[in-house]
């Protein structure tokens, strides 16, 4: 959020007023990036323990029907829509007044994000096309970067780093989210029902019209969101697309302090970070680790493609994309950022997790063995990326802090060069 917003006039709130300056609510704790990452990690550990110590009870709970969907489906197709609604709000803000609103500033991380999706998908496909027992259907699994987890790690280890490093990672992850949303919409929509889709579009359009006419009572939007989500689910298009669409059509106003995007994010983000994502992790990350699964992590094309895609593909794609953009355009890295910072961020971007888990369920909907193997690979790659990327960024932060203390400067890379 830009500093200019501090002087903007207030507007009537959508739901309730934001937390006062001298008050700390539980919801404020859940808005903290570190808290969200730790809850996700705790839910992942709990899922692994439950799946391996109580394998039958874990799968019984996941497959328990609750109305029209199983609990696992409620997590992936229902609750995760809230997470994508937050992603849509983030995208809207960035498009209007953030890093994606200034093409010159956004070009490097956007190209880096695209290359950081193409290279992992290419590496996975290469492993699985060349192998006789390969399964190319999982090509989309290593494409995503988990924005919540990556920013949580950066918040823990990023002391001393230039603010532009966080801005680069944020823009990269948001562009990555947009790419993942497009992939889900284009490649994982099945059995399209035009009438249900028309109903979803009508709800999304109604949301946009109400936003245009400044309808600020948030409770009017709740049934529209639910009906639009249900129509999207029944249409054959993945239901999370509805969340993104609602977020993108939410109004944001540069001259208003408490605009609708801020209000919705302020109210919904604690539920997303504190309930939705941890519960999705609990329902998705429960991999039964047998000797066969462990062996497959090091030998099977699915596992090799995912791990190499997230660890190597992200680094190669993001670094190469950034380098070529800086070399052949007038775009530059942020103030104080050097290429070693970009490489460290590229390693951290190998944290796939939330969207990679969703891609796994979409890629192998009927083969639990392949899905478990893929999820175990995502977990291992994400863990390695978090450790390696965190260590590298911590080292970079110390280097920046030492240079600042000595009143010396590490010269940023100028546009058109990529040799630092």
From Swiss-Prot:
Alphabetical UniProt keywords: Antiport, Cell membrane, Ion transport, Membrane, Sodium, Sodium transport, Transmembrane, Transmembrane helix, Transport
Any one of the GO CC terms: plasma membrane
InterPro entries registered for this protein in UniProt: Na/H_antiporter_dom_sf, NhaA
Identification of the protein by name: Na(+)/H(+) antiporter NhaA
Native species: Cutibacterium acnes (strain DSM 16379 / KPA171202) (Propionibacterium acnes)
Gene behind the chain: nhaA
Record membrane topology: Multi-pass membrane protein
Transmembrane annotation, as ranges: 34-54, 69-89, 107-127, 141-161, 168-190, 194-213, 271-291, 301-321, 342-362, 374-394
Cited function: Na(+)/H(+) antiporter that extrudes sodium in exchange for external protons.
Catalytic activity line of the entry: Na(+)(in) + 2 H(+)(out) = Na(+)(out) + 2 H(+)(in)
Family annotation (Pfam families): Na_H_antiport_1
Family, as annotated: Belongs to the NhaA Na(+)/H(+) (TC 2.A.33) antiporter family.
GO BP term, example: regulation of pH
A GO term for molecular function: sodium:proton antiporter activity
């Amino acid at each position: 959020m830009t500093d200019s917003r501090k002087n903007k006039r207030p507007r009537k709130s959508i739901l309730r007023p934001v937390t006062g300056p001298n008050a700390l609510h539980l919801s404020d704790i859940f808005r903290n990036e570190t808290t969200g990452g730790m809850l996700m990690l705790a839910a992942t550990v709990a899922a692994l323990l439950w799946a391996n110590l109580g394998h039958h009870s874990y799968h019984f709970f996941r497959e328990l029907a609750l109305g029209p969907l199983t609990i696992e489906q409620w997590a992936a197709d229902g609750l995760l829509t809230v997470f994508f609604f937050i992603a849509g709000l983030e995208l809207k803000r960035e498009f209007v007044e953030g890093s994606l609103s200034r093409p010159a500033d956004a070009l490097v991380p956007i190209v880096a994000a695209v290359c950081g999706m193409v290279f992992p998908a290419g590496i996975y496909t290469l492993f699985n096309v060349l192998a006789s027992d390969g399964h190319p259907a999982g090509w989309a699994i290593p494409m995503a970067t988990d924005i919540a987890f990556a920013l949580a790690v950066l918040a823990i280890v990023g002391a001393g780093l230039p603010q532009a490093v966080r801005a680069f990672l944020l823009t990269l992850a948001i562009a990555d989210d947009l790419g993942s949303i497009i992939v889900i919409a284009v490649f994982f929509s099945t059995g399209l029902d035009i009438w249900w889709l028309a109903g979803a579009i009508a709800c999304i359009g109604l949301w946009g019209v109400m936003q245009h006419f400044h309808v600020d009572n948030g409770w009017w939007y709740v049934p529209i969101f639910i009906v639009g989500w249900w129509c999207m689910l029944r249409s054959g298009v993945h239901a999370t697309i509805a969340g993104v669409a609602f977020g993108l059509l939410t109004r944001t106003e540069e001259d208003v302090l408490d605009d609708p995007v801020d209000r919705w994010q302020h109210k919904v983000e604690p539920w997303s970070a504190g309930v939705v994502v941890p519960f999705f992790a609990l329902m998705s990350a429960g991999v039964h680790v047998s000797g066969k699964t462990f062996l497959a992590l090091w030998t099977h094309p699915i596992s090799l493609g995912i791990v190499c895609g997230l660890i190597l593909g992200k680094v190669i794609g993001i670094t190469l994309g950034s380098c070529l953009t800086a070399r052949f355009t007038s775009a530059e890295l942020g103030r104080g950022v050097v290429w070693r910072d970009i490489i460290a961020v590229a390693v951290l971007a190998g944290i796939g997790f939330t969207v990679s888990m969703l891609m796994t369920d979409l890629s192998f909907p009927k083969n639990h063995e392949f899905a478990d193997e893929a999820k175990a690979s995502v977990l291992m790659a994400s863990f390695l990326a978090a450790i390696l990327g965190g260590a590298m960024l911590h080292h970079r932060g110390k280097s920046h802090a030492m240079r600042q203390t000595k009143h010396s400067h590490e010269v940023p890379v100028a546009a058109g060069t990529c040799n630092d």
